[in-house]
Amino acid sequence: MFSIKTKVIGLLGSLMIAGTAAVAQDNAALIDALVRKGILSDQEAEDLRADLANENAASVLMTSKTPNLSKLVVSGRIQYQYVNLNTDIAGTTADPATVNHAFLRRIRLGFKASFLNDWSSFINYDFGSNNFDAAYIEKIFNPTWTLQAGFKKAPIGYEEYFVSSGAQKAIERSTVTRYFVESNNGRRLGGGKYRQGVWLLGKVPSGLTWEFAITNPEATGVTSSDTIATGAAANNTFAYWANVGYKKSLAENKGTFTTGASYGFLPDQGGKTLGAGNDLTVWSIYADLRYSQFSLLGEYFGSDNEKGASATRDSSSNGYWVMATYRTGAFEPVIRHSFTDSDGRGIQLGDGIRSAASGGTHDKLTEWFFGANWYIVGNEAKHEVKLQAGYMTGESKDIPITGVSAKATVDGFRSMMQVNF
């Protein structure tokens, strides 16, 4: 027999199909009345409002310009950030100037066009960086196999690849993630980020997932010159990527547990200078536990970098991050710790901590972040309007290779306002 709540959802679904502004107002009034009568909880009402808004938006964006286009969905993200960071270099009074600045972190607008026979395309542009975040064509062959071709991130690193920038709980990604995946500057490895290539994705009902990719070896943005670029001897060998994961629901559907590993082999992308015949291998293992209001996440990175430390010395940079959160109502305290050992290659504060000054080149970097998230509109899964703030502190130490004692520290405040749609 149907419950009252089931009937309510069915009624709201019927109203939703009508898709007019007047009906949307009626929906809101009806939901408010059901909350007052105790038929719906505040959280259930919030979820229903979000679902109705999403479905109404999707129906408005559907078009019949061609009978082969089934749906066109528009999405977007605005992130406005303020940061105040103070850097202190041991043994000198000539410290870098304090960073005290506000800026637009991301301004993204995306379009997904879905066609008949499970073909689709996705374009996501970031006006903040004047570059594409994704641009690819997708074909779903069956519930198990999906093929993507174009421009997107390489499948390496849980925090980097699987957790959207809009869902980061500590505002920015960890120092070790940034050191491993962001562009090679002679210190960072460049073992991730955006690539041109082909991705093959798979999944089965048991929770097992896998993903394989073949891409150009170098990380790139998409500009007008990329459409005619032919490559060079230093980057004409493909890079190979793989990720295998497993996700399981916990008892009584109170949470989930996810674990997996990722791997990347990048020919000619190792060493201090790209294209010199030195190869780079990166990998990670990760776990993500969500139980009720609590979450615990972590990841370990490792690498083999030919001539990564110097012209005569390889390096095996490694590190980890771990983060815990606890959701209470609309608020979510966050604590995260990360550590990076460059193994003689070198790392600066700014290589791992966004917006920080360099502080000099050292061998190891440690970071702590203490903060909180306020989900103003939406919840942890939807986060349409979110305010984040926190205190962070970091320390880089020791001279690479020689191990001579040296140190630089940074600490300060970071906040970000975000709107997703």
List the predicted regions and their residue ranges.
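N-terminal periplasmic/intermembrane-space "pro-region" immediately following the signal or transit peptide
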Residues: 2, 10-15, 19-79, 88, ...
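Glycine-/small-residue-rich active-site loops that bind phosphorylated ligands and cofactors
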Residues: 40, 129, 368
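Short secondary-structure boundary/hinge segments and terminal tails
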Residues: 51-53, 131, 157, 306
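Short, P/G- and charge-enriched loop/turn segments at secondary-structure junctions
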Residues: 61-64, 185-187, 229-231, 274, ...
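Outer membrane beta-barrel
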Residues: 62-220, 236-252, 320-345
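Outer-membrane beta-barrel pore domains
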Residues: 86, 95-96, 135-140, 168, ...
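Active-site-proximal beta-alpha loop/turn segments in soluble metabolic enzymes
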Residues: 213-232, 266
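Interfacial loop-to-helix transition and helix-capping segments at the boundaries
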Residues: 231-237, 278-280
